[in-house]
């Protein structure tokens, strides 16, 4: 308990480390993905975020490039990026704080060493779909299971893992996507490209669910969704399909 309290007290503490230099190439990659998310219409406010973890010799868990509070992914510049550590949220580069959601991002990165990018967005159609009473997302197409490679984990509206990260450890090993009812979603990836692609297939699946339900209702039929067996087979073969290896 005391250790957790001590770590929490260091969140957003400005602790510049000369060993942590701002890598402009990483910053420009961050801006590229932030811009692509914004151009797709996913960015609703300053509270959505993208986090990219990069390795660092001094920090075994790497360091996080993340947007500071008060600006959106749509309007940000390189000057709005800060660098934090993973365990405590201390600001190693920059002088502005992070949003509360960065505590969730850091906990995900701490528990999932295979994950190096996290995208959190308050996506309109996702919020609306679950506000309409749907309990889970059905799968209509092949791309979602091949790329996401796990079922979404659903959090009820009364659980906010941005403010209280404790529940994350109970489910994060089994999913690459958290759907937060009345809130939005959080997507994990091994790199920024995969995380961005998974975000796109999630958004696409939400929209297809809405369209399939509307069109089927108009025709008096039921939508056709993939079966559990089909989905889980695609999960298992996801890497082979999405990232086939070159042969000599």
What is the role of each PLM region?
Residues 2-248:
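Glycine-rich flexible loops
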């Amino acid at each position: 308990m005391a250790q957790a309290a001590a770590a929490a007290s260091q969140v957003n503490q400005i602790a510049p480390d000369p060993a942590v230099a701002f890598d402009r190439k990483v910053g420009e990659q961050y801006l590229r993905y932030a811009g692509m998310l914004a151009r797709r219409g996913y960015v609703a406010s300053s509270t959505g975020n993208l986090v990219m973890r990069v390795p660092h010799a001094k920090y075994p868990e790497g360091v996080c490039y993340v947007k500071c509070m008060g600006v959106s992914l749509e309007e940000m510049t390189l000057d709005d990026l800060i660098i934090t550590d993973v365990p405590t949220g201390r600001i190693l580069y920059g002088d502005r704080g992070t949003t509360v959601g960065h505590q969730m991002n850091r906990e995900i990165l701490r528990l999932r060493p295979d994950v190096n990018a996290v995208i959190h967005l308050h996506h309109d159609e996702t919020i609306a779909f679950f506000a309409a009473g749907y309990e889970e997302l059905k799968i209509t197409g092949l791309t979602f299971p091949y790329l996401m490679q796990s079922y979404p984990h659903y959090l009820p509206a009364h659980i906010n893992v941005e403010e209280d990260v404790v529940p994350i450890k109970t489910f994060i090993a089994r999913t690459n996507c958290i759907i937060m009812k009345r809130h939005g979603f959080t997507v994990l990836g091994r790199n920024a490209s995969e995380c961005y692609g998974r975000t796109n297939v999630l958004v696409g699946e939400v929209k297809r669910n809405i369209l399939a339900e509307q069109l089927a209702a108009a025709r008096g039929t039921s939508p056709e969704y993939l079966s559990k067996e089909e989905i889980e087979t695609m999960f298992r073969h996801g890497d082979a399909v999405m990232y086939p290896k070159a042969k000599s």
